[in-house]
Amino acid sequence: MVSKPHGGKLVERVAKGKTRERLVEEAKEMVNVQVDEGLAADVANVAHGVYSPLEGFMVREDYLSVLEFMRLSNDLPWTIPIILDVDENVKKSVREGDEVAIFFKGKPIAILYVEEIFPWDKNYHTLKVFKTDDLNHPGVRKVFNKKDYLLGGPLIQISDVPEPFEKYRLWPKETRVLFEQKGWKRVAAFQTRNVPHLGHEYVQKAALTFTDGLFVNPLVGWKKPGDFRDEVIIKAYEALIEHYYPKDSVAFSVLRMEMRYAGPREAVHHAIVRKNFGATHFIVGRDHAGVGNYYGPYEAWDIFKNFPDLGITPLFVREAFYCKKCGGMVNEKICPHPEEYRIRISGTKLRKMIMEGKRPPEYMMRPEVAEVVLSFEDPFVH
């Protein structure tokens, strides 16, 4: 059986038909809150059940509970606050019980039923979520650029958020049907924001060995400068899957969600989201969702000990490297040879090669994947 949604029920908050038309008209008369791409993605993810059991943006009780205990106020595991920030003007013009229109790029996308408006302490927030308030951390910097009040309450989506990669996107309702159709009972999900190298392939295939299917689910959306652009990641995975994966054992879909770079907490968040898609297992990488040296390499593994009730099984697959003596990709558990035989695949090293227009060697990256990446004039975010 694919996993049950987090909290037991898949949330759906999308207006349809006549109701939708009426709400779009009404939204034009409401106080409106303009949101950026990341918040528009959060709206869609709430509405389509990616963030089940959340039905909107967090009210104070849930928000503080998540910061302090990594659980919602009903004790369900949840590690990343899903919040809507607004300025003083909105605060003055809105009361609890009001309806507010959420606008993205000049178009109303949702209506929020305001339950609470409250100030937040950004310092406390960053220390809890990121374990640092250092402004060099991209997630911290983003928080300090946000507005001073939070609006909490349930929402209903009233028009689609444009998605440039629509043909690659499946919502939880759809992946659950897909996994059932394929007859998969055990599904391993893989989260990524990178183009695939042989280390990723090794980890994915190790997970696939003892599950029925692999769900590759890269994030698209805001990333820090130096990360790969979305279309490069998608095309690179298409090439890898086409040439090196058994088609009936892999499902591929993109997820529009911002990277927070919150390390251990974000690893748990990524697992919960994939549970909502129907995955039963989640591959947790070394320094998962980390950035710089803010988190220890295996901190993202340790945090899962706090959540025996998570409802999705974390898979801690050791980092793979190429061993010249073994003649292939291995990990520390199965390779007896000393360090001088081991070639570790570092993302930094790979990015540097690609930046210089060099083709990575075949023990690092499949030639078909390298071909795709090098075909882009500029594969990186700036």
Swiss-Prot record:
Protein name: Sulfate adenylyltransferase
EC annotation from Swiss-Prot or TrEMBL: 2.7.7.4
Domain of life of the source: Archaea
Gene3D superfamilies membership: HUPs, Sulfate adenylyltransferase
NCBIfam families associated with the record: PRK04149.1, sopT
Single annotated GO MF: ATP binding
Phosphoprotein listed as a keyword: no
Catalyzed reactions: sulfate + ATP + H(+) = adenosine 5'-phosphosulfate + diphosphate
Family: Belongs to the sulfate adenylyltransferase family.
Any one Gene Ontology BP term: hydrogen sulfide biosynthetic process
UniProt keyword annotations, A-Z: ATP-binding, Nucleotide-binding, Nucleotidyltransferase, Transferase
Gene name of the encoded protein: sat
Record organism: Ignicoccus hospitalis (strain KIN4/I / DSM 18386 / JCM 14125)
Protein's pathway: Sulfur metabolism; hydrogen sulfide biosynthesis; sulfite from sulfate: step 1/3
Keyword Ubl conjugation: no
Principal EC category: transferase
